[in-house]
């Protein structure tokens, strides 16, 4: 998205490219909320985004590349919001609270991009990203099965609670319960 401005000798962000990307992404999310990824036609997406097919293909290889890009952005945003939590030593209570809040803040995008059979992919990618962060902070993390299991328990359990119990319990009580369970699991594991 950065283009060389030869007249001024500097770099500038081409606002038209950014606006086109936003229009395509918005149209994609609207269509994706109504149908599976495999059913979305580029023709329909372009009509909704008010762009030509050639414009779409100048930005993305195909519909899957667009979906992957949006998934990657969402995962990165969630991981960035959780990275403020000190992950080593694994503070399961704080991690669980922040993860749940990040899931809630991104609920619409999570439910659209990772619907149906893609739900497991989402939780696994979050876990993988956290595992990589923890290993960078402490290389011994990768070879510690107890901490790895504890991380899996926190991420997968938190996501399960988010997807299956968010409507049954108010957010504060659910987050408090998850934090209590995570704290107890940490005591058992360590």
Model-derived regions: residue spans:
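Helix-turn-helix
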Residues: 31-65
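C-terminal peripheral helix-coil segments that are non-catalytic and often amphipathic
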Residues: 4-7, 164-190
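Cytosolic nucleotide-binding catalytic cores of signal-transduction proteins
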Residues: 32-35, 142, 146, 167
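Secondary-structure edge/capping motif, primarily at the C-terminal ends of alpha-helices
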Residues: 81-85, 110-113, 165-169, 189
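Amphipathic alpha-helical packing segments from all-alpha helical-bundle domains
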Residues: 117-141, 145-156, 183
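Basic, helix-initiating cap at the start of DNA-binding domains
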Residues: 2-35
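Helical hydrophobic small-molecule/effector-binding pocket
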Residues: 89-127, 131
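Alpha-helical structural segments
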Residues: 22-30, 48, 65-84, 94, ...
């Amino acid at each position: 998205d950065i283009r060389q401005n030869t007249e001024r000798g500097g770099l500038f962000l081409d606002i038209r490219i950014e606006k086109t990307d936003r229009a395509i992404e918005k149209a994609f999310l609207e269509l994706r909320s109504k149908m599976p990824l495999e059913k979305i036609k580029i023709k329909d997406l372009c009509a909704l985004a008010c762009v030509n097919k050639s414009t779409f293909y100048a930005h993305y290889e195909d519909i899957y590349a667009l979906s992957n890009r949006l998934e990657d952005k969402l995962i990165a945003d969630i991981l960035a919001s959780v990275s403020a939590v000190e992950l080593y030593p694994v503070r399961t209570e704080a991690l669980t609270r922040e993860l749940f809040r990040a899931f809630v803040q991104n609920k619409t995008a999570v439910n659209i991009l990772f619907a149906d059979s893609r739900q497991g992919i989402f939780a696994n990618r979050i876990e993988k990203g956290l595992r990589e962060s923890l290993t960078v902070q402490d290389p011994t993390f990768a070879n510690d099965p107890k901490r790895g299991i504890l991380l899996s328990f926190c991420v997968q359990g938190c996501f399960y609670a988010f997807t299956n119990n968010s409507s049954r319990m108010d957010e504060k009580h659910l987050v408090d319960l998850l934090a209590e369970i995570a704290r107890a699991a940490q005591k058992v594991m360590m």
